[in-house]
Amino acid sequence: MSQSSLNMPGSHDPVALEAMRVRLQGRRRFKNAIALTMSLAAMAFGLVWLIWILYTTLRLGVGGLSIELFTQSTPPPNTDGGGLANAIVGSLMLVGLATFIGTPIGILAGVYLAEYGQKGWLASITRFINDILLSAPSIVVGLFVYALVVAKMGHFSGWAGVFALALLQIPIVIRTTENMLKLVPNALREAAFALGTPKWKMVLSITLKASVAGIVTGVLLGVARIAGETAPLLFTALSNQFFSMNMGQPVANLPVTIYKFAMSPFAQWQSLAWAGVFLITLAVLGLNILARTIFSNK
């Protein structure tokens, strides 16, 4: 203790020390209260809009639900009846095929980055491109596929939509797969190598098996991402008013149908649009909850 502090008046006075302690605690409590209040206000601000959106979707979407919604195709303008059967089936086809194509590519690329490439130049380039695709707006991907596929073919098609959606899903699967594989302890790899296990078998039987829950979570999050994408489909698959499973032609889908019906002046189309919004919201929420449940259980 310095001489100046020894000579300070009241430096050994218990009452003065207690008063100083109380003042310091009061300042800390005040700062903590301000920080906590601001945090709660920010959380409430976000939750209010989320709850409002969900409430509006539920209130307006449930009213449009009916058996005809799942059994009839989209109706002509200014007519009663009709449904979204063709758009629902079209969306399932587009998302399913995009997932079928994008999932194995994303997993294989993630395995390469985590187990083989690591710090090589090819891995660095792959990660850089993957980061760009992760942050790129979906409309940019749609325009890219339009110029690459639709303009060359001379017409819109379901396959172009599948290609665009797969490009949006692949980066998510790559990032998730790489991160999950990196979480596997190196001791497991070293133990497998010590037993003479080839690297490909070690990856297949140990690291992939240990991280399968995280990879499945990434795939489900990728599906949830592309399920409601509208912009890329406007430039690729477009839509139609009929029930068609011909992927070489424009394919009806929920996002574009919702966009078209919501912008129309017809009450029946607007009701179907809200019903479609409710279905997509329900599907995306369900996929996110399922992904979190699978990951937390593992």
Model-derived features: where do they sit?
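Periplasmic/extracellular loop-to-transmembrane helix junction in inner-membrane transport proteins
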Residues: E18-A41, Y55-A98, K119, T257-S271
